[in-house]
């Protein structure tokens, strides 16, 4: 199964008087084509046109990850009780568990992903919350199947996460070429085009477009010039009930 999610078909939102623009390939309660699946509940790509601040607000149960694609974010939460700076290439993992509150200050020009997972909500709320920063220096690119790859989460990563069967990677393509990506037919994937124009399994996509994939073992990817893909892999079938189901 391949489902295209062009930027204009995602859930798009503007807040803070036009200073914060978000396109969301996964968002609960908005549009049927971007509804949650597997353990992936929410995925937002945001651009800060001006400085923005989200005041202290609560979360529980979900595992929430923020990836700084460019720019700067300062984060405060009630687990650490300090403001923590995050820069380009860094990411954070909030295991909100029994409950946590946090604030975010986002600098002008920043782009980031915020992604929520259900790690088994009904069990997570029995655990104490935690917050962990990870820095770009600890995630050097490697060559995987002939493609320059950063492994954020999954086998080969130092990141500690609760969500079972989760893999998150960033792929860099530096020349015109065709690639055949090996997929697991027992997994679901969403690929997000971070940079460049690409053709994925015969479908033309550009920056900020996305594609959902399942029940495939191979994926043909072609870039005309350099480009980047960011993808999330989760189990096709989970062994626990999701909070939204």
Give the residues covered by each predicted segment:
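"Short basic amphipathic alpha-helical interaction patches in structured regions
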Residues: 79-87, 106-107, 127-133
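Conserved, well-structured core segments that form or line functional sites
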Residues: 100, 110-191, 195-203, 207
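Structural motif
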Residues: 72, 195-197, 228
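Short acidic-glycine-tyrosine-enriched beta hairpin
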Residues: 77-95, 184, 199-223
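Ligand-binding loop in jelly-roll beta-barrel domains
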Residues: 96-126, 214-243
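Conserved hydrophobic/aromatic beta-strand scaffold that supports enzyme active sites
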Residues: 45, 64, 91-93, 112-116, ...
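Conserved short histidine dyad/triad with adjacent acidic residue
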Residues: 3-31, 41-59, 69-76, 80-83, ...
């Amino acid at each position: 199964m391949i489902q295209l999610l062009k930027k204009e078909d995602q859930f798009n939102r503007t807040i803070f008087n036009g200073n914060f623009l978000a396109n969301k390939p996964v968002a609960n309660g908005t549009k049927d084509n971007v509804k949650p699946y597997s353990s992936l509940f929410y995925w937002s790509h945001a651009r800060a046109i001006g400085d923005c601040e989200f005041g202290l607000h609560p979360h529980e149960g979900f595992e929430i990850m923020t990836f700084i694609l460019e720019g700067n974010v300062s984060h405060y939460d009630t687990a650490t009780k300090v403001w923590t700076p995050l820069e380009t290439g860094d990411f954070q993992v909030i295991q909100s568990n029994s409950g946590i509150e946090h604030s975010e200050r986002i600098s002008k020009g920043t782009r980031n992903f915020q992604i929520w997972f259900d790690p088994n909500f009904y069990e997570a709320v029995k655990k104490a919350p935690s917050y962990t920063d990870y820095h770009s220096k600890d995630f050097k690119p490697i060559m995987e199947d002939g493609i320059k790859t950063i492994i954020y989460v999954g086998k080969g990563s130092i990141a500690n996460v609760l969500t079972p069967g989760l893999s998150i990677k960033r792929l860099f393509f530096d020349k015109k070429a065709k690639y055949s990506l090996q997929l697991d037919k027992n997994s679901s994937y969403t690929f997000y085009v971070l940079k460049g124009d690409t053709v994925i399994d015969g479908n033309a996509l550009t920056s900020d477009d996305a594609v959902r994939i399942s029940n495939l073992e191979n994926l043909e990817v072609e870039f005309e010039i350099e480009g980047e893909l960011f993808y999330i892999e989760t189990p096709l079938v989970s062994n626990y009930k999701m909070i939204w189901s």
